[in-house]
C-alpha cells in the first residue's frame, strides 16, 4: 500500500506526471523519514519506562509532542519556503512541476512525523492492537481520497493525501490521549 499513489498516478496519468510526483515524493521523504526515526527511537524507551504511571506518561507525551513540533515546524516551513530555489539549483528548470508537489508533501510530512511520534506513544502505553486498526482506517481513508480526487489531477490527488495524513494524525492524537 506504500506505493499506491505512484501506482495510481502511473496508471491514470502520463509518465511525465509520475516522474514529477516521484521526484517530489523521493526528496520529501528523505528528511521526513530520517527525522521521524531519530525522534521515534529517542522517545520510545522513555515512554515504555513510564507505562505504569499514566499521569506522568501523559505529561511526558505532551512535552515530547511540543518538542517534536518545535523541531519540525521550522525545518519543514523552511523547506516549503525554499523549495523553488532549492529545486532550481539542484535540478534546473526541468523539474519545476515537482515544486508544488514537493511543498504539499513536505506539509504532509509535518503530520507524518507527528504521527510517527504518536505511534511510539501508543506502543509505549501498550496499545499495540490499536495500531493495526488505525493503519486499516488510514488505508480506507486513502482509498476514499483517491476515489474522490482521481479525476481532478495530480495536485488535487496529493492534496487528498495531505488531508488523509491530517485525519490520521488527529485520530492518533485522540487515541493517544
Predicted regions and their residues:
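Hydrophobic/aromatic residues within the transmembrane alpha-helices of Major Facilitator Superfamily
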Residues: 4, 31-34, 77, 110-114
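Hydrophobic/aromatic end-of-helix segments at the C-terminal termini of transmembrane alpha-helices
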Residues: 4-9, 13, 23, 39, ...
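Interfacial/gating helices of multi-pass transporter permease domains
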Residues: 8-29, 58-60, 96-102
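Short helix-capping/hinge motifs at transmembrane helix termini and TM-loop junctions
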Residues: 9, 13-14, 82-84, 91-95, ...
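Helix-loop junctions and terminal segments of transmembrane helices
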Residues: 24, 28-72, 118-124
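Alpha-helical transmembrane segments of multi-pass membrane transport and lipid-handling proteins
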Residues: 61-113, 143-151
